[in-house]
Structures are given as structure tokens and as C-alpha cells.
């Protein structure tokens, strides 16, 4: 394990902050070379230039945005499984090492990732609605899952940074929040009622923000004059596994990983190395 990775891991104070507030913003972790490669990977993915297709994925089922959708908020799931430059970013051991420290986990595996592109412009429908990641992961046994949000460039207020409701992971926030909801006013009231702070994650290039799966988060419009470009890397502790669950409306809960990781008998294997590779500890 490289000394650089060890020295970059969160301190005890950082871990305590994360567990109290539900998020943590790292010092610079990633090199320009890795982020420049990720930018190339994003352009390739958006152009349909991929290194491989995902096994057991019905064509187009999980890919998300395509050029036919126009210049809107773009979200593409599983991008690192298709494009090598994005896999390089996801497999940076310092990301999973930080996640392991924050979650108190001996092992970290990829859950899935999302390539995110938010166009600039005040009239665009490009808010990311207030939501918790846990809302979409009801079939996961672990409550310690977390996300590393990796921007490819400096993020200032005008870019529409990720915003966290600090401490919301410790409360019952409900399950009716939605990623694509353009109304961000409801959580202002929620935060005021529970005496919680809303924090914006402004970062310099190379920094990463981490948040707990139950932390309420979202982002506002991008007014920077350039698209906001990033990768959300969703991570699971090694002991996470599939559980039967239902949505609030009573329907059976599921996740696209259920199909991608299905065993011969149909049950999902969230440790399938082809879809959910181990990222920490790093390979010898």
C-alpha cells in the first residue's frame, strides 16, 4: 500500500466529523492526470465510444442519457464498467481507503457509479432534487453505504455544488424525495424544523466529498457558464448483501444491480467481481 494513500486517509477527527454530520470533504486526493483521463472518458461515453458493454444489460436499459435527450442534466449509471478512463478513477485506492475509514469497514466494494453532467443556464431543468441514496438502495442490508462525489474541476457556488443537510443521516427523513425533483424549497423547511444546517460542497480540483447513504443532499442550478462534470462513486462495505424489501407504496423494491449480478437461481450477488469489484484493501 503506497505511503501516499496511508497519509491521505481520514484522521480520527475526520471520522468523528463524518459520523456526526453525515458528510466529509477531503483534502486534494486525485492527480491532474487521473482527472484529465476521466474528462476524456466522459466525452467518450457521451459519444457512445465505449470499451465494453455490461454483461446481462439489456441494450440501453441502464445507460441513461443519450444525445437524443438534448442538453439537459445527464446521468449515466455504470459508466466505469464501460469506459477504461472512468474505471481508472473508480479504482483509485485512496477513494476506497477513505470510504473504509469513514464507514468503519474492513472491505469496500463498488456498488455502482453515475456519470453526471449538469449544463449551465438559469432556465435549464438541471437541479438535482433533495434525496437520500438509501431511498434507492432498499435491497441492501448495510446502513453504512456511502458515496464519493468526484468533480473533474474546481467547484464554486455558481456551479451548483452538492449541498448536504448536515446531520440528516441520523433522522428519519422519509422516502419520498426524488433525484429529478426541481423544487428545492421543501428541505429548507425541513432543515429549519430540525435545526439543521445546509452546507455547500465547494471544492478545488482533486478534492472529493463523501456522504452517508442516509444524508439528504441535492444541488441547485449551474450558472457558471460551463457544464459541471463529475462522477458519483457509490460504495458498499464488504458485508453488504441483498435483502428482500418493499417500496413505500408496497411494490417490490429492486435495483438494476439485481439483474446485473444475478446468480443462476436469480438471486443477486452484490459481491460479483465483474460488477461490484473489491476496491479496498487494494490488491497486493
Feature map (PLM): residue ranges:
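A short secondary-structure junction signal
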Residues: 122, 126-130, 140-141, 158-164, ...
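Short edge-strand/loop segments of extracellular domains
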Residues: 118-120, 165-172, 228, 234-240
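Short, conserved beta-strand element in jelly-roll/cupin
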Residues: 138-157, 202-203, 210, 234-237
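Non-heme Fe(II)/2-oxoglutarate
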Residues: 3, 40, 48, 59-60, ...
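Short, structured patches in soluble enzyme cores that scaffold and shape functional sites
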Residues: 114, 132-134, 150-154, 166
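Double-stranded beta-helix
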Residues: 16, 155-216
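A short beta-loop-beta micro-motif enriched in histidine and acidic residues
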Residues: 103, 133-145, 196-197, 203, ...
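Non-heme Fe(II)-dependent double-stranded beta-helix
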Residues: 2-20, 27-130, 136-139, 177, ...
